[in-house]
A protein has these predicted regions:
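Well-ordered alpha-helical segments embedded in enzymatic catalytic cores
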Residues: 7-10, 73-80, 134, 253
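Conserved helicase NTPase motor core
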Residues: 1-10, 25-29, 227
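A short glycine-rich beta-strand->turn/loop micro-motif centered on a GG-aromatic cluster
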Residues: 117-127
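Metal-dependent catalytic core segments for phosphate chemistry
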Residues: 1, 8-9, 34-35, 39, ...
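Helicase P-loop NTPase motor core
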Residues: 16-19, 24-117, 140-145, 212
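Conserved helicase C-terminal RecA-like lobe
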Residues: 90, 104-116, 129, 136-317
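Structured loop/turn residues at secondary-structure junctions
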Residues: 3, 25, 69, 99, ...
Length: 317
């Protein structure tokens, strides 16, 4: 990251007597794959020319298919995988590669809906990523104020001066009086144990009530976008700069997921969207670890081999 390719390209000019050795023979890929690779990389003008070759057979010709949208692309891939499995092959023979992990959501959605087991190498599934779980937790608490588990997750994310000790006291009071934690927070002035945290708790309730009001009359996408903004989550990630870029793109993808779900259903609500997410998150928990479609970035795939490989998101930019 941050490397300058000119250091390699200009090396012979900088150091007299440089001898370039080209490692062109490939022992792993079939001829048709190498021909495609040579053709593609040939468009790159800033490189030392070389031509990959092999003694292996030409093999199967790789195919390139253009799609109108990423959803069309992934739905087509999933149908192709289903045919591949129906022909007697294993899920573990299939790899789906992408340049950036943020591209994984759409293909995960399509795989999960068809109950195709998959695993992600070198990363987390979309709905297992911390920032995604945070936004989903906000939506869950809006849908159900008595969801104490999700409330614990987001009450101090971003930081609101509501520490772990205060949260534990709220949980203890809720258990003692057999009410939800939200009920305790709304009546913080009645409980001396959390009196010092009342200003911070009041601020949280004000923010929460604002988001609940937005849930009435807003689309799922608008509500999710509002949660990201008014919770302070967007600002928290933006303040992280480059380090928060991928996380911000992931939470924005939750907005896309909400919009896509709403477009696919004539009548829907927040609870139904959250139920869908729950199903997508748990689809392959009972399947064996070995026999799953493998998903990973191109970088993580180096040195690995699969019988059937899809590379998604190949776009001109």
């Amino acid at each position: 990251r941050g490397a300058d390719v000119d250091n390699i390209l200009n090396f012979p000019q900088e150091f007299d007597g440089t001898h370039i050795i080209k490692m062109e023979q490939n022992y792993r890929s079939d001829g048709n794959i190498l021909n495609l690779a040579n053709s593609l990389i040939g468009h790159n003008t800033k490189r030392h020319n070389k031509n990959l070759w092999t003694y292996r057979n030409p093999g199967v010709m790789p195919t390139y298919t253009y799609y109108a949208s990423d959803y069309d692309e992934t739905d087509s891939i999933v149908e192709d995988i289903k045919d591949y499995i129906a022909a007697g092959n294993n899920y573990s023979d299939v790899a789906i590669l992408y340049r950036n992990s943020r591209l994984s959501y759409v293909i995960e959605r399509s795989l999960a809906r068809e109950k195709i087991p998959y695993k992600i190498v070198g990363g987390f599934k979309f709905f297992e990523r911390a920032e995604v779980k945070d936004i989903i937790a906000y939506l869950c608490v809006i849908a159900n104020p008595a969801d104490d588990q999700r409330l614990k997750r987001i009450i101090n994310v971003p930081a609101r001066k509501i520490g772990a000790a205060t949260v534990d006291k709220i949980a203890t009071l809720a258990q003692q009086y057999k009410v939800s934690m939200m009920e305790i927070i709304r009546n913080a002035d009645l409980y001396p144990a959390i009196a010092k945290a009342k200003p911070a708790l009041d601020s949280f309730i004000k923010m929460y009530d604002t988001m609940c009001l937005m849930a009435n009359g807003s689309t799922l996408g608008e509500l999710t976008q509002s949660v990201i903004k008014y919770s302070g989550y967007r600002k928290m990630l933006e303040d992280k700069g480059v380090d928060g870029k991928d996380e911000l793109q992931n939470v924005e993808q939750v907005v896309v997921a909400a919009e896509e779900f709403e477009h696919a259903h004539i009548k829907t609500n927040l609870s139904e969207f959250l139920a869908e997410i729950s199903l997508l998150s748990a689809v392959d928990t009972l399947s064996s670890e070995e026999n799953k479609v493998v998903m990973m970035t191109l970088h993580a795939s180096k040195g690995l081999e699969f019988k059937n490989v899809y590379i998604i998101g190949l776009e001109d930019s």
